[in-house]
């Protein structure tokens, strides 16, 4: 595998050449194709992480992503690019950005994109080689090719009226209100904690500092990453991905990097944000850096990196590393975020079966017809007063499985992939606290795509995303409960 060692070697043309070669190898090999998801965006070649520029332009949905096509490990960041018409089948285009300019040879880091008339405008973090100083830059394109503005970088330390860590100022969120462009970014303040700062411009050239809209006082981790800002169902929303958070099982936070939603009110005169509610977005091991967009039909959609920084689970022999979650529809109820798979998922369903099953106490059973690695499973049940737990195993083979455990006694849901075949040097267990509804009825939905499991509990009040790497032939699904348990189900194979 060729690795270009000098930043001067990086170009869109070379990245595109590498991508095409890698895709052709995978297309020609049934073995390589068998490793890839059917309806999630996965890296076309090498490494991907954060979703970038999630947006609609020219009647298509565009998703860019942090990209290093030359190995399956993180390296100098490019922007990969894919488009879709149905949110399910992605077509890869040539990479949009490469670290090939004097102001971004240290990498083209994360950012966002908007449709503005006939132009597709990208805001991204440009990293200076050597000193790793991070600034914000602009590129303008037609949906296929993107040109960096000659005036880049657009926003630097000169635009900020206070001291901060100049190696930690990144991830611009771009939006437009009336005729004014706004750009929100995150930076590390003098005490090491993160802040969400806002700038404005009339022409994408001259930017004025507006406010510190919100910041961590070290209670929400340290440096913040990948901010988003939008309004939904009458509520203003800021999304951030804080680093170095401390575990708080009651609030759903775990040690390390988290992804957090803050609902409240943004004062449009002072551009200061008042929080009403703060919570985890997804409680799973493999979810980070979510980004949203507004669909033409008015839905707020979200997608995230289905991976994690604290240890990588992708097998070393893969030609690629990194996937995105399913696009999810969002809504806010009483300040709380609810998520559900984009409704386009329903078009993939086939061979549906439905019924109910009475589980005997402490006996593992299979349900006829319920098996596979590409499926959509809907479960509904009333938790018996005396029932302590329900266990569901997926990707069950002769010597492997991954399992969800619903601990009703202690109000915990956990995922355990320690026996899945996934490499042992990454985290294998995660749990979170949930509330059992007053009527004790729980609805949940699990979507599996070869090596990923996205679970939505209590109609999307809780999301729980995890990946696992088990042999493809491991396709069993079993259920067990501590006491007699009635389970209603719908099960669909997914194309």
Model-derived regions: residue spans:
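Beta-rich carbohydrate-recognition and catalytic domains
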Residues: 1-171, 176-220, 231-283, 304-356, ...
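Beta-rich accessory regions
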Residues: 3-5, 22-27, 257-495
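Catalytic-domain carbohydrate-binding cleft regions of carbohydrate-active enzymes
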Residues: 221, 226
């Amino acid at each position: 595998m060729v690795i270009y060692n000098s930043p001067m070697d990086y170009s869109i043309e070379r990245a595109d050449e590498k991508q095409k070669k890698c895709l052709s190898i995978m297309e020609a090999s049934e073995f390589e194709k068998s490793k890839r998801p059917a309806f999630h965006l996965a890296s076309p070649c090498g490494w991907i992480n954060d979703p970038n520029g999630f947006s609609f332009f020219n009647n298509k949905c565009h998703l860019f992503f942090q990209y290093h096509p030359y190995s399956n490990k993180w390296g100098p960041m490019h922007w990969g690019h894919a488009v879709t018409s149905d949110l399910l089948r992605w077509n890869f285009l040539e990479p949009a950005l490469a670290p090939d300019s004097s102001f971004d040879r240290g990498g083209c880091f994360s950012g966002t994109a908007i449709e503005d008339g006939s132009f597709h405008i990208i805001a991204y973090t440009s990293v200076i080689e050597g000193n790793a100083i991070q600034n914000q830059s602009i590129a303008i394109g037609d949906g296929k090719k993107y040109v960096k503005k000659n005036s880049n970088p657009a926003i630097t330390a000169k635009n900020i009226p206070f001291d901060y860590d100049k190696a930690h100022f990144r991830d611009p969120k771009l939006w437009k209100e009336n005729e004014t462009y706004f750009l929100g970014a995150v930076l590390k303040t003098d005490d090491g904690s993160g802040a969400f700062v806002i700038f404005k411009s009339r022409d994408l050239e001259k930017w004025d500092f507006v406010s510190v809209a919100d910041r961590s006082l070290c209670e929400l981790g340290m440096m913040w990453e990948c901010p988003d800002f939008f309004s939904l169902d009458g509520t203003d929303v800021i999304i951030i991905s804080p680093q170095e958070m401390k575990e708080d099982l009651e609030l759903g936070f775990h040690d390390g990097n988290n992804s957090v939603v803050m609902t409240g009110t943004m004062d449009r005169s002072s551009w200061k944000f008042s929080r009403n509610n703060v919570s985890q977005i997804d409680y799973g091991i493999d979810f980070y850096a979510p980004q949203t967009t507004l669909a033409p039909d008015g839905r707020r959609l979200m997608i995230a990196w289905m991976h994690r920084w604290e240890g990588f689970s992708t097998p070393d022999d893969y030609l690629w590393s990194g996937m995105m979650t399913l696009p999810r529809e969002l809504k806010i109820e009483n300040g709380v975020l609810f998520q559900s798979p984009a409704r386009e998922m329903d078009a993939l369903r086939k061979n549906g079966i439905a019924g109910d099953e009475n589980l005997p106490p402490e006996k593992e059973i299979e349900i006829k017809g319920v098996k596979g690695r590409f499926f959509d499973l809907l479960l509904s049940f009333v938790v018996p007063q005396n029932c302590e737990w329900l266990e569901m195993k997926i990707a069950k083979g002769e010597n492997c499985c991954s399992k969800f455990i619903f601990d009703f006694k202690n109000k915990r849901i956990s995922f355990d992939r320690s026996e899945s075949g996934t490499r042992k040097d990454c985290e294998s267990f995660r749990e979170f606290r949930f509330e059992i509804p007053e009527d004790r009825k729980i609805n949940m939905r699990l979507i599996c795509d070869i090596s990923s499991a996205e679970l939505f509990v209590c109609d999307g009040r809780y999301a729980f995303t995890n990946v696992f790497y088990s042999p493809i032939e491991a396709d069993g699904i079993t259920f067990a409960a501590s006491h007699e348990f009635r389970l209603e189900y719908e099960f669909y194979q997914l194309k």
